[in-house]
């Protein structure tokens, strides 16, 4: 088995967690769409929530069970749920579309804000878990 292969039970946990995460992302983005001027701000919001929550969960796991590594809970919630709740590819497409529409400042704010905001959100989640 190659280093990239994942046992079926682990892949199943990721898949089971991914379904509600993707569903929630779709629901939140569709709910926010009429309230915000551009669809990408819904994606921004779910990415920030997912980054915060993933930082919190990973820090709690490291604090409570540091030796467990990629535990079933991390595979289910961290990789599956929060991995599908957040979406880097949609973020990248939305930045590109904003650039194509010649909205340079908005594209810059979206790109930099997403990256820095994501880092700050993870740090806040870690801080909450450790504080």
From Swiss-Prot:
Membrane topology classification: Multi-pass membrane protein
Family indicated by similarity: Belongs to the fluoride channel Fluc/FEX (TC 1.A.43) family.
Ion transport listed as a keyword: yes
Protein name (record): Fluoride-specific ion channel FluC 1
Catalytic activity: fluoride(in) = fluoride(out)
Pfam families: CRCB
Cellular localisation: Cell inner membrane
Ranges that cross the membrane: 4-24, 40-60, 73-93, 108-128
């Amino acid at each position: 088995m190659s280093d990239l292969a994942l046992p079926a039970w682990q892949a199943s946990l990721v898949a089971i967690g991914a379904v509600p995460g993707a569903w929630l992302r779709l629901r939140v983005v569709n709910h926010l769409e009429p309230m915000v001027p551009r669809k990408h701000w819904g994606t921004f919001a779910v990415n920030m929530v997912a980054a915060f929550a993933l930082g919190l969960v990973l820090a709690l796991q490291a604090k409570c069970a540091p030796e467990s590594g990629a535990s079933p809970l991390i595979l289910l919630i961290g990789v599956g749920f929060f991995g599908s709740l957040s979406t880097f590819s949609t973020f990248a497409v939305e930045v590109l579309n904003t650039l194509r529409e010649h909205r340079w400042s908005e594209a810059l704010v979206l790109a930099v804000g997403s990256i820095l905001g994501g880092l700050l959100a993870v740090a806040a989640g870690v801080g909450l878990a450790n504080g």
